[in-house]
């Protein structure tokens, strides 16, 4: 990181070790005392802030326990935008505490506002059995944006990477859908993306396939290199995701609604079509 020029990065995404006492082949100590972990985090965060352009976006993915304290540190140097809660679906028994059901994604910017901010829109949530809306939009149906509903700060549609078709390593890895959403929101084709904890290369491959320039850091690069040499599966997944965003209804939902007599003519429906083509073009750049 010290070798990179200051003010060169448009978007920085960091998924650091969570300090959970895990064993890594690199022999990194993942069981630091709390203050030691926070001091280490502040050192890399300060260096990362140096790299950001004015208006650049800074994302940190971590446990709420750590992001609560790191957020306070970041707020003294950057402008807070969002705390995004990312739902996790594991249901492990925990005694004496509420069940922790989300990861935290901190979003800060360098300066008063981001230079790039165009979040994806999402389809209306529908019943998978009948196609009916899960929420009542009342008399506002004809006023809704045909490209979908606004993205909120609770993301419950980010799946864990379990399917072997997409999973690239035995250890945990981030969903490509998460990075697709982050990069779409805070970068453009040609933007410079940096990830200081590359892992299996999810940020790298997302940036590559979405037409961003990128650089990253990782001690053990074998998984990321193998993934970048064969991006067919990741490209297929991104193309699938492109058909499911920036539309008011997914095609399958529209078909199910028609089959079960649900009216869609009150909405300004834009399902796939030209929007689908635009998204595919973006992925293939």
Q: What would you call each of these model-derived segments?
A:
Residues 1-223, 272-285:
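Core catalytic lobe of class I
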Residues 223-285:
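PRPP-dependent phosphoribosyltransferase catalytic core
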């Amino acid at each position: 990181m010290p070798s990179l020029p200051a003010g060169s990065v448009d978007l920085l995404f960091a998924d650091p070790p969570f300090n959970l006492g895990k064993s890594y082949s690199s022999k990194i100590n993942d069981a630091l005392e709390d203050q030691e972990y926070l001091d280490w985090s502040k050192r890399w965060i300060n260096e990362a802030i140096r790299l950001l352009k004015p208006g650049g976006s800074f994302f940190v993915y971590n446990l709420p326990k750590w992001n609560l304290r790191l957020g306070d540190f970041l707020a003294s140097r950057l402008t807070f935008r969002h705390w995004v809660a990312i739902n996790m679906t594991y249901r492990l028994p925990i005694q004496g505490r509420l069940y922790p059901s989300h990861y935290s994604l901190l979003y800060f910017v360098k300066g008063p506002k981001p230079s790039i901010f165009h979040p994806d829109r999402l389809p209306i949530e529908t019943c998978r059995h009948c196609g009916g809306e899960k929420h009542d939009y009342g008399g506002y149906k004809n006023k809704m944006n045909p490209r979908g509903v606004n993205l909120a700060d609770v993301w419950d549609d980010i799946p864990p990477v379990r399917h072997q078709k997409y999973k690239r390593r035995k250890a945990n890895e981030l969903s490509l859908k998460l990075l697709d959403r982050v990069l779409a929101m805070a970068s453009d084709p040609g933007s410079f993306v940096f990830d200081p904890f590359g892992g299996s290369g999810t940020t790298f491959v997302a940036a590559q396939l979405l037409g961003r320039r990128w650089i990253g850091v990782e001690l053990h690069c074998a998984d990321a290199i193998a993934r970048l040499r064969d991006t067919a599966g990741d490209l297929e997944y991104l193309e699938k995701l492109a058909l499911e965003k920036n539309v008011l209804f997914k095609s399958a939902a529209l078909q199910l609604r028609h089959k079960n007599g649900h009216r869609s003519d009150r909405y300004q429906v834009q399902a796939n079509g030209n929007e689908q083509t635009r998204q595919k073009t973006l992925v293939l750049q």
